[in-house]
Structure formats: structure tokens, C-alpha cells
Amino acid sequence: MSDSEQTSSGTASSGSKMKDFNQRFRDLHKMRQKARKENHAQVVEEDRRKKLPKNFEAKKERDQWQVKELQDRKEAEDKGLDYERVRSLEMSADVTEKLEQKRKRKKNPDQGFASYEDMTLRQHTRLTAALDPDLESYKKMKECVGGDQFYPTADTLIHGNHYPTTSAMDRLVKDVHGQVKRREQYHRRRLYDPDAPIDYINEKNKKFNKKLDKYYGKYTEDIKDDLERGTAI
């Protein structure tokens, strides 16, 4: 092979290598640009999620569940079926009972004692929700009192014009007895035990000692026994 042929062959080989290098470089550049766009999109999406409320995902799932429930309810109504019954058949008895209890708590939730005003308002809400309108008694009372007195104005004297029915009085008595019973159940104090050991100075200290005994009693039991027996530690 002559020198000229070797030179041309080397030039062609170098050109081929350079071409392959440029192609790989362009491919790497495209991959870099693609990765940059994907990273930018992920950063934008992460920033968008951070700006959303903390309960956004839970609210979104709840909204989707409510939409699905409305659709299922509409389908059941179109088929002439009772949606609550159909849903109960698809769930276990335990789940159905928990959902019913949650629904009742949602209507008038018990958030614990905050103030006497809140407690009174909650009781008022519960009592008014339990009232059933009696149209017959309403009409009779209107006839008995008269239209002018039944819809009073600022100049109307209504003292002594209300005549409760026997059934209404019975409901009142029954409700009062129920309130007393519930009050005894919720606010029942434990009886004093004279034989119980006294290791407290007041009620607050008594509760604190119970908490300590719950978590550290098994570690201090031997020390207490030694102190009571007078054994040297």
C-alpha cells in the first residue's frame, strides 16, 4: 500500500471517528436537555404542591368519594332501589355500624367540655333536632288562642295563653328523666375506698401518681416493698 493510500485511509478513519463523536455528543446534548426539562417540570410541580393547603389531598379524595356516592345514589334511584340498603348489603355489619355512628357524631359532634355555653348550645341543638312537628296540636292551639294572640306583636300579652298538651308534658318528663340518667352516667364519681393506700396530697397529685405508677410501677415495686419492710437498700 502506498503512502497516499495510507494517508487517505487514515483521514477517512479520523473523519468517521469524528462523525461518531459528534453524533454521540448531540445525543448526550439531547438527553441533557430532556433531563433539564423533566427536572424543571418536577420542581414546578413540587412547588405547586407545597403551595397547596395541607389537607388538599384528603379533601380531593373526599370530594371524589362524594361525587362517586352521588352517582351511585342517582343510579340506585333510577333503578328504584334504596341506596342506603344497597350500600349496607355491600359492607360488613361492623363497617356499617361505624359509619352510622360517625354520621350521628357529625350532626352534633361532642368535642368535650369547653364551656357551659357550648354545652348548653349542644344540648339545645340535640333537643330541637329531636322535635317532631305536630300539626294537629298546632291547629288546635291556633283555634284556642285566636289569630291575634297566636301571632303576637309588640303589644300582645301572651302570658298564660299557652296550654301544653298531655303528650307534650309526658315528653318533657321523659326527656328530663333521660337527662338525669345521662348526667349520672357521665359525671358519676368513684366511691372513696378507705382501705386504699394514700400516697397523694390532693386530687391532682393523685392522678399524677397514677400516671407514674402506670409507666414506672414495675420498676419501683421492689423499692417500695423494701421501704415498707424497712429493708436496707
Swiss-Prot record:
The organism's place on the tree of life at top rank: Eukaryota
According to the UniProt record, where is the region Disordered? 1-80, 95-119
Asked if Ribosomal protein is a keyword of the record, the answer is no
Signal sequence, start to end: none
Main subcellular localisation: nucleus
Bias class Basic and acidic residues marks the residues at 17-80
Which ranges form a coiled coil?
Answer: 18-77
Q: Which BP terms does GO give this entry? A: mRNA processing; RNA splicing
The record's GO CC annotations read: catalytic step 2 spliceosome; post-mRNA release spliceosomal complex; Prp19 complex
Q: Where in the cell is it found?
A: Nucleus
Please provide the record's keywords in A-Z order. Answer: Coiled coil, mRNA processing, mRNA splicing, Nucleus, Spliceosome
Output compositional bias ranges, type Polar residues: 1-16
Q: What does this protein do?
A: May be involved in pre-mRNA splicing.
Assembly information from the UniProt record: May be part of a spliceosome complex.
State the family named in the UniProt similarity comment for this chain: Belongs to the SYF2 family.
Q: Give the protein name, as stated in the record.
A: Pre-mRNA-splicing factor syf-2
